[in-house]
Amino acid sequence: YEHLVYDGAKPTCVATLSDEARARTIIVAGFSKTYAMTGWRIGTTVAPLPIAKAIAELQSQTSSNVTTFGQYGALAALKEKEKTAASLKLMMTAFDRRRKFLHAELNKIPGITCLLAQGAFYLFPNISSFGLKDVDFCSRLLEAEKVAAVPGSAFGAEGYLRLSYATSDEIIKKGVERLARFCATLRK
């Protein structure tokens, strides 16, 4: 997610903090989000040499190779820097618009509070005021309004939802309208 940041935020890699930190850091990155290669299962690892060798040995025994098209796609993403940068800029402009819209709409719903994310393409609204476990909230929301949300507890954030805005503006608008309608039924 290091390229999916907003409002001038600059992520800091822990490996850049000191030589000691670099010697103890393993960096794992994927192509799924930044390069829209979701499901292709290709990524990179940067680690001190002994750890990198151990990772390579373990990987060779636990999974098969990356698909050929995935390798070519990753190579093109890295080699075609100008095209990649232009595509990323277009994607981030759309994500930023959706992020701001969803954030504003969520905060209009009585009982929900939500901070504005600085990276990725998820928001984590707080739904704890409704008195339901987040898992139950998500299950009931799906059943009642056909809106899929991920319980925050899956990420260590009980009482929150994870909502993605990596979809169309229309779907986000419909989804937040349905979420608001569902929340209104919980307040009755």
Task: Please place each PLM-identified region on the residue numbering.
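PLP-dependent class I/II
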Residues: Y1-K188
